Amino acid sequence: MKIKHILFFVKSILIYSLLFCKSYMDSPYSCYKIEGIAGPEDFVYLEEGIFLVTSHNRRDLESLGEIYSYNPKTNQVQMIPRINEPENFSFRPHGIDYRKPYLYVILHGNTMDTKWHSVAIYEFKNNVLILKKNFQHELIVSPNDLITLSENEFYITNDMKHRASYFELFKTLFLGINYGSIAYCNMEKQFCQIVSDELGFPNSLAIVDRKLFVSTTLENKIYEFRIDKDNPAILTSKKEVAEIAGADNIIYYNEKLYITSHPSIMKFMQHSSNAEKYSPSLAYEIDPNTYKTVPIFEDSGKKISAASVIIKLNKELFIGQVFNPYLLRCTMG
């Protein structure tokens, strides 16, 4: 074992021990639950003023998931019908993106270490999701989230080389050896290419102008890449723009980046198998031009555990989570 890996191991043990013991405050905001959506891990906010929300009970991987709509004006939750799917379609949604009129959904198989993954493309029309395409590629090995460049192009994160590999997870957590990557895919050409690798559990993506932002959950960093103007399969000028422990989903809205985080990975892992074990959550607003990072939410886990996605609309926060069956809606200040 190299000296740098030994030093990283000792540092990691100290950091994770401190974070496990650290206490987090309960959110002071007035919040209430939007119930009835199992594991609302990711969402997109449409210009029509509604959310499309992924739903899957991740404590029961055999179960299938759904997509729900949520209207903040009426406070109404509605399951979205899906049509044109083949029989026994493995609809277990993860990260999503929306490029009108299409919803792009990462899907997985029914085990934690599944090798079956796809990107399903649905047309969202008359409040129905119509499956148009189901894209698979050998370089999509452990997908977490995606962001579209055009109707047929997207970037997608592979958080590991082998999904749910405890060996890779241990080496990333305690030795600083990273296995994650970002791939560029062109569905029209049936083409994918790895455009960045050796990332520590790359999670989510956002595009602002020609800049690609990526959160790395186990590196605790937000990176910015420049997208080559002539070839989107080339990323240049990798730069760290923020340090956020356990960063999860990124949403770009109203000229700001909104990012949730899991400051204690150990408590997150406990919560993944036991809903009674709280997993604290933090969230931030980042200016993509100046990189100014402002905390906007903190909770010990009493109001919401393992918060995975957040957006600020006026003076309200809307928050999703990985496991428990509700969104959280909070009024700030």
For each feature predicted by the language model, list its residue ranges.
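A short helix->beta-strand "capping" segment at the edge of beta-propeller domains
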Residues: 22-38, 294, 298
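Short, conserved, GDST-rich strand-edge loop motifs in beta-rich repeat architectures
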Residues: 53-63, 106-114, 156-176, 260-278
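Beta-propeller blade signature
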Residues: 65-72, 117-124, 175-186, 278-288
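Blade-loop segments of beta-propeller domains
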Residues: 66-99, 107-109
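Short loop/turn segments that connect beta-strands within beta-propeller blades
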Residues: 71-75, 124-127, 186-189, 227-230, ...
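Asp-box/WD-like beta-propeller blade repeats and closely related beta-sheet repeat scaffolds
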Residues: 90-92, 106-149
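Loop/turn-rich, solvent-exposed surfaces of beta-rich toroidal or solenoidal domains
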Residues: 244-288, 292-294
